[in-house]
Amino acid sequence: MKCKLIFAVFMLAFSMPSQAERIKDIANVQGVRNNQLIGYGLVVGLPGTGEKTNYTEQTFTTMLKNFGINLPENFRPKIKNVAVVAVHADMPAFIKPGQELDVTVSSLGEAKSLRGGTLLQTFLKGVDGNVYAIAQGSLVVSGFSADGLDGSKVIQNTPTVGRIPNGAIVERSVATPFSTGDYLTFNLRRSDFSTAQRMADAINDLLGPDMARPLDATSIQVSAPRDVSQRVSFLATLENIEVEPAEESAKVIVNSRTGTIVVGQNVKLLPAAVTHGGLTVTIAEATQVSQPNALANGQTTVTSNSTINATESDRRMFMFNPGTTLDELVRAVNLVGAAPSDVLAILEALKVAGALHGELIII
């Protein structure tokens, strides 16, 4: 049976000229970035959907000790409305103490659901071990789970992960190099020597010669005023300068799991003839039991009968002329009813043969 080829082909910027983009859309200012925060805490108030693990009990007991409540030795509290969780948040650059962050709360243990729970005060630390924010509040959980008495279970979305909008208060800000030094450095989101040079030229055309210089395919260094109050307006001017990015290199990206093929600009094929045969081998096992007569002095035996069938589908050969695009290749392969795996095999073979001009990336 022929397998219909199911995949998407996107031609990126076929013959369309590159459009100018603002610097803020293609580059970041070095040092101006988010910082990841993480913490370990307790969610309480769960309607019997919590967990009973050793580390949950230990964390709960430690919390009580911090409030001056000491439990007897070897006493194990029976709790089902508590869960230990990991709390994380992204701290934007320039955020100040007193401002709020959204936090995500994820169960670390066997809790069935965090719906209805409240996160108790949790310290959020940076990679340096310092506390930068404190999180607390009621969780918003979109998922839910329900268990039946017969063991059946219904789960929608993810009930063990929730969010607390504005659930953390910033206690300490993070220093950035924005206000120090004589230079500002921009880093391109997609490294390209041509784009880096064009960006430096565009800045120099506006501000004057030698104000900007490309350091490599990613970084462009710009002379900046030392006065911090002038840097904001200076950067506001820079980030709105329009630059025409260079054309992307020829690439073909194939997702081997979904069959999606993305074809970039300038991908070409040299003359080539392609044929791809499909050999299918089917092995069927049939187990038979031989049972002797009750009065006979024999033994029950089990035998296996194997049936092996091999079929090879008829595949056509197709030839490509100079300058053939991958779009035309995909259409030709579609006509012969190839599967996504067949297309991937053909692309790999063309690349090895040197007939595919472009980088083949398989994800």
Swiss-Prot record:
GO CC, alphabetical: bacterial-type flagellum basal body, distal rod, P ring; outer membrane-bounded periplasmic space
UniProt superkingdom: Bacteria
Location within or outside the cell: Periplasm; Bacterial flagellum basal body
Keyword Magnesium recorded: no
One Gene Ontology term from the biological process aspect of the record: bacterial-type flagellum-dependent cell motility
InterPro entries on file: Flag_FlgI
Pfam families: FlgI
One MF annotation (Gene Ontology) recorded for this entry: structural molecule activity
Predominant cellular place of this UniProt entry's protein: periplasm
UniProt signal peptide: 1-20
Keywords: Bacterial flagellum, Periplasm, Signal
NCBIfam families, per the entry: PRK05303.1 (NF003676)
Function: Assembles around the rod to form the L-ring and probably protects the motor/basal body from shearing forces during rotation.
Quaternary structure (record): The basal body constitutes a major portion of the flagellar organelle and consists of four rings (L,P,S, and M) mounted on a central rod.
Family: Belongs to the FlgI family.
PANTHER family the record matches: FLAGELLAR P-RING PERIPLASMIC PROTEIN FLGI, FLAGELLAR P-RING PROTEIN
Full protein name: Flagellar P-ring protein
